[in-house]
């Protein structure tokens, strides 16, 4: 199929197909685009080109807060059901793009690829993606500008998420609170389970450090909570809940990408 797609002028597509099937009567058809020329417009007008470039350069996709606990938590021995209290939720958040998007989605898919050994690749956030993050933050129509930055610790990409959080705090002149603590014995998450199991796995995964908890009630604005990749949203839901229980006001989640 790649060879078929790459056929050029003078290489008949129909002749290619019939020759591949050992047809002794294979001959140029005279009608396909390589024989008769493209039947579709081959030029793009300036307005369409500008619209396409604008779409490719677009940043910002929403992270909606979860409003209910998954069904079945009591069966796992966890007493959570019904609505998540409003005072424990995060506000609507943002990612730069979804992994399925064109434009920045391409760079983000490369960023979250794994190496030849099957392990996640970890490096500081690149300058182009850092600039896209700052654009996303500038275009965010939040009710109140954040006053501080905290981040979700990562076992797979610790350098990426810490560099992202530190860079945003420096650029925005925000207080850098640091990361949440990982609970002792925390292991890489199993991302193939359903919502109830995902929540179970992150429910006691994080802790608010004492030094951070002491500063939260004194902040003059929301906490910007940084993560690298949003998948089920349960990690951000629980991390924000911990921050709010520890005295934070609004929590605004932000990440590089969302899966799906």
Outline where the language-model segments fall.
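PRPP-dependent phosphoribosyltransferase catalytic core
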Residues: 36, 51, 55, 237-260
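C-terminal helicase lobe
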Residues: 1-56
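Short loop/turn motifs at secondary-structure junctions
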Residues: 28, 145, 247-250
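Structural motif
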Residues: 152-155
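Generic enzyme active-site microenvironment
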Residues: 225-226
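Active-site-facing substrate-recognition patch
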Residues: 48-148, 158, 162, 166, ...
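Hydrophobic alpha-helical packing residues
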Residues: 168, 172, 243-244
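Activation segment
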Residues: 231-232
């Amino acid at each position: 199929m790649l060879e078929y797609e790459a056929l050029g002028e003078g290489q008949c597509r129909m002749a290619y197909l019939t020759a591949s099937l050992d047809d002794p009567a294979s001959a140029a058809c005279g009608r396909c685009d390589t024989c008769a020329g493209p039947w579709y417009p081959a030029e793009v007008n300036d307005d369409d080109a500008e619209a396409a470039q604008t779409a490719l350069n677009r940043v910002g996709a929403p992270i909606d807060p979860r409003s209910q606990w998954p069904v079945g938590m009591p069966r796992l021995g966890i007493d959570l059901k019904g609505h998540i209290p409003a005072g424990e939720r995060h506000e609507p958040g943002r990612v730069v793009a979804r992994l399925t998007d064109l434009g920045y989605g391409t760079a983000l898919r490369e960023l979250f690829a794994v190496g030849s050994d099957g392990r996640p690749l970890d490096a500081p956030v690149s300058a182009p993606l850092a600039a896209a993050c700052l654009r996303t933050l500038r275009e965010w129509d939040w009710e109140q500008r954040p006053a501080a930055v905290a981040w979700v610790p990562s076992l797979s990409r610790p350098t990426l998420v810490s560099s992202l959080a530190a860079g945003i705090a420096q650029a925005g002149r925000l207080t850098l609170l640091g990361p949440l603590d990982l609970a002792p014995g925390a292991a890489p998450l199993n991302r193939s389970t359903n919502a109830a199991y995902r929540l179970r796995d992150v429910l006691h995964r994080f802790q608010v450090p004492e030094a951070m908890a002491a500063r939260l009630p004194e902040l003059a604005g929301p906490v910007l909570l940084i993560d690298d990749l949003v998948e089920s949203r349960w990690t951000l839901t629980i991390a924000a809940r911990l921050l709010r229980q520890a005295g934070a006001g609004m929590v605004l989640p932000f990440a590089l990408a969302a899966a799906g």
